[in-house]
Curated annotation (Swiss-Prot):
Interacts with ODC1 and thereby sterically blocks ODC homodimerization. Interacts with AZIN2; this interaction disrupts the interaction between the antizyme and ODC1. Interacts with GGN. Isoform 2 interacts with PPP1R16A; Modulates PPP1CB activity. It comes from Rattus norvegicus (Rat). PROSITE patterns: ODC_AZ. One of its GO terms (molecular function) is ornithine decarboxylase inhibitor activity. It holds the Pfam family ODC_AZ. One of its GO terms (cellular component) is nucleus. The lineage of its organism: Eukaryota, Metazoa, Chordata, Craniata, Vertebrata. InterPro entries: Acyl_CoA_acyltransferase, ODC_AZ, ODC_AZ_sf. GO terms for biological process: negative regulation of polyamine transmembrane transport; negative regulation of stress fiber assembly; positive regulation of intracellular protein transport; positive regulation of protein catabolic process; viral translational frameshifting. This is Ornithine decarboxylase antizyme 3. The keyword Ion transport does not apply. Belongs to the ODC antizyme family. Keywords: Cell projection, Cilium, Cytoplasm, Flagellum, Nucleus, Phosphoprotein.
Length: 243
């Protein structure tokens, strides 16, 4: 006799899991010794009606949230409070398989001209997000570093320490020129905490350089809390092939 119980046929639960995992490919003192990950899990319970009872089937889906670029060794030596965004240390670094980690094992020089050197962890034609570091020499003994992540024709940059200094502005200009001329990137994003002590000055400085504030619900933004994103759109000819 068929079961007549009245029950919902679908239950769903979502949660986010963050953590830190040891990367054994690097010594413990390396800035790459650990990577931080963030997974979004969705557990769904479906119930099907059978002649005598309900049958439950559980599905568990895992969604990798957006990566965050690593800091290089000089930047990792800065005090925690001096990092461009404290959430960088809580960054959403997705766990990878051993084979993938070997492919991303070291940054290699991709381009060097004038004061700008560009380092990459992977070929730019790779389908996965790629780490891009931009090192701009200010003096013989100092340089400005912009750490970025290239993903789906979009470049996300973490602002360096003391981003408002003139040297850092020059380094960003050189970075934007390289991105426009040498890559197929359509948009460059910078980000900083919404409660940053220099929030107003940062908004004015980046606006002056052509950046625009991005609304929080923009579909291209990663799910980072308390962060302001600004975007620099690159004008591309419709017939221009990706480089």
């Amino acid at each position: 006799m068929p079961c007549t119980r009245s029950r919902p046929s679908l239950y769903s639960l979502s949660y986010i899991k963050r953590g830190k995992t040891r990367n054994c490919l690097y010594p413990f003192w390396s800035p790459y010794a650990y990577y931080l990950y963030c997974y979004k899990y969705r557990i769904t319970l479906r119930e099907k009606m059978l002649p005598c009872c309900y049958r439950s089937i559980t599905y568990k889906e895992q969604e990798d949230l957006t990566l965050r670029p690593h800091c290089c060794l000089p930047c990792s030596c800065l005090p925690y409070s001096c990092l461009p965004c404290s959430e960088s240390l809580e960054g959403l670094q997705v766990g990878r398989s051993t084979a993938q980690e070997k492919d991303h094992s070291q940054l290699k020089e991709l381009y060097s001209a004038g004061n700008l050197t560009v380092l990459s962890a992977d070929p730019l034609l790779h389908q996965d997000p790629v780490q891009l570091d931009f090192h701009f020499r200010l003096t013989p003994h100092s340089s400005a570093h912009w750490h970025g992540l290239l993903c789906d024709h979009q470049l996300f940059l973490d602002i360096p320490f003391q981003a408002l200094e003139q040297g850092n502005r020059e380094s960003l200009t050189a970075t934007l020129e390289y991105v426009e001329e040498k890559t197929n990137v359509d948009s460059v994003f910078v980000n900083f905490q919404s409660n940053h002590k220099d929030r107003g000055a940062l908004l004015r400085a980046f606006s002056y350089m052509g950046f625009e504030v991005v609304r929080p619900d923009h579909p291209a933004l990663p799910p980072w809390d308390n962060v302001i994103f600004m975007v620099y759109p690159l004008e591309r000819d419709l017939g221009q092939p990706g480089q």
